[in-house]
Design a protein with these regions (language model features):
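Extracytoplasmic "Venus flytrap"/periplasmic binding protein-like
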Residues: 26, 44-107, 142-145, 243-244, ...
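Hinge/lid segment of periplasmic solute-binding proteins
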Residues: 83-131, 159, 264-266
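Short, solvent-exposed loop/beta-turn-alpha elements that line the ligand-binding surface or hinge
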Residues: 100-107, 151, 174, 193-213, ...
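Extracytoplasmic/periplasmic solute-binding protein
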Residues: 121-127, 132, 156-202
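A bilobed periplasmic-binding-protein/Venus flytrap-type ligand-binding module shared by bacterial periplasmic
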Residues: 134-139, 196, 279-293, 311
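Glycine-centered hinge/linker elements that transmit conformational signals in sensory
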Residues: 159-165, 199-230
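Extracytoplasmic/periplasmic substrate-binding proteins
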Residues: 187, 214-295
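Long, aromatic- and glycine/proline-rich binding clefts that accommodate carbohydrate-like moieties
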Residues: 315-376, 404-420
Length: 420
């Protein structure tokens, strides 16, 4: 037994010392670009130019986090660079090195600030971004309310537009991803509620939230009833079941790529508190246990090069975090979405509402509260006030159980994010 242990220890030591003799491929440990085709594109199109090679591993959050925690606990590891959403990296800051030396020129200051994770160090560097947008068939534009600016719509104008479309065409032409695979919860968390309340969590049961849900009920009355089954809005846009839709950019792309002349993209509407939107920010970070710090820093800077940012866009449909010109041969969807994202993130009333964070394995239950609220109020016809009061208690209990502090646009909290 002793001999076996000694052999195992020797083998482990040999693995540990291997980089000293021949620099190993950099292990890029990521929650992003998980599908087989995206991981392959990352390896072959994005990372192939990195000297020494990269072993890109995209995986689910559970195993991703388990290995990170094991390496942090051991004080030694093999991961060169972490890739993850803002919420994935939040909470790991104690084990991450300062990346202030990275080449971050061209990244918006507000986006860069997110990477500090509440510290005075650059704990991650923004790597790529996506968001959700509105899309419309050009045929719908002639029915826009008088004086409405497509790039600066309000929710009231969207309701008026949807109503006009219904009347002009003899059926509802607004579509919404409210099916089982749809991202409806992100609309409520990142768009509707913050636009009316300036909050995702704290003001969940407020009078302003009541107004938001009443407005959405009015909007739903002008929405194609098949929306209760929609997952990816590019499909009903292409069949013209709907003429106007909201969805994640990755779920709208096919419509623009197949029929580039027929569709336009534009920012989400604004409510009384601003033009709320949910930026999906992915970042790269380096653990203090990285086996070769020079290699890790080189890979971080490689990910920020303009040509790498463009290659990442081609591979993942995530947009550059740097303000760089895009090549002429980009897909039609990219050409349409780029200006719309810029108009939304740069709007004078822009109100970023981050993805939920600090919830760990309870993220699904958090999302379910927003989905249940929608289903009870909008589909089930339950009174708004009664529903909000009941769901607010479920939300408060979940925040207390997870201990998750508030995230933007809610004000920072010392303990669990309060539900007033």
């Amino acid at each position: 037994m002793h001999r076996m242990l000694t052999a195992a220890a020797a083998a482990a030591l040999a693995l540990t010392l291997a980089p000293a003799t021949a620099r190993a491929e950099a292990l890029f440990w990521s929650t992003q670009a998980k599908p087989v085709e995206e991981s392959q594109a990352m390896r072959e199109q994005v990372l192939a130019g990195f000297e020494g090679g990269v072993d890109y591993q995209g995986m689910d959050n559970g195993p991703w986090l388990t290995r990170i925690q094991a390496e942090m606990q051991a004080g030694t590891g093999t991961i060169a660079v972490l890739g993850g959403l803002h919420g994935d990296l939040s909470g790991l800051e104690a084990g991450l090195v300062d990346l202030s030396g990275a080449d971050t020129a061209g990244i918006a200051p507000a986006t860069l600030e997110l990477g500090r994770l509440g510290t005075d160090e650059q704990k991650y560097v923004p790597w790529m971004q996506a968001t959700y947008l509105m899309a419309a068939n050009r045929k719908a534009l002639e029915h826009l309310p008088e004086g409405a600016d497509l790039n600066a719509l309000t929710y009231d104008q969207l309701i008026a537009w949807a109503t006009a479309l219904n009347e002009a065409t003899g059926g509802p032409k607004l579509g919404f991803p409210a099916g089982p695979q749809g991202l409806k919860h992100r609309f409520f968390q990142g768009f509707l509620l913050p636009a009316y309340t300036g909050s995702t969590v704290t003001q969940f049961r407020s009078a302003e939230a009541e107004t938001a849900w009443e407005a959405f009920k009015t909007l739903w009355a002008q929405t194609n009833p098949a929306s209760a089954n929609y997952g990816f809005m590019q499909e009903p846009l292409l069949t013209e079941e709907v003429w106007v839709a909201f969805d994640h950019v990755a779920r709208l792309g096919d419509a623009f790529n197949q029929r580039p002349d027929d569709f336009v993209a534009f920012p989400a509407p604004a409510g009384p508190k601003g033009r709320a939107f949910m930026p999906v920010i992915a970042g790269v970070a380096v653990m203090s246990t990285a086996p070769d710090m020079d290699q890790s820093m080189a890979l971080v800077n490689y990910m920020l090069k303009p040509e790498t940012q463009v290659a990442t866009l081609r591979a993942t449909n995530f947009f550059p975090v740097k303000d760089i010109p895009l090549p002429d041969d980009m897909p039609a969807s990219v050409k349409a979405f780029g200006p719309a994202i810029a108009a939304m993130t740069g709007a004078p009333d822009a109100l970023p509402a981050l993805l939920p964070m600090g919830l760990g394995e309870m993220g699904g239950q958090f999302n379910q509260i927003y989905t249940d609220t929608f289903e009870q109020i909008v589909l089930g016809g339950r009174p708004v006030r009664d529903t909000l009061d009941a769901q607010a208690e479920a939300l408060r209990a979940l925040m207390v159980e997870t201990g998750a502090p508030c995230w933007a646009p809610d004000a920072p909290s010392d303990g669990p994010c309060p539900v007033e």
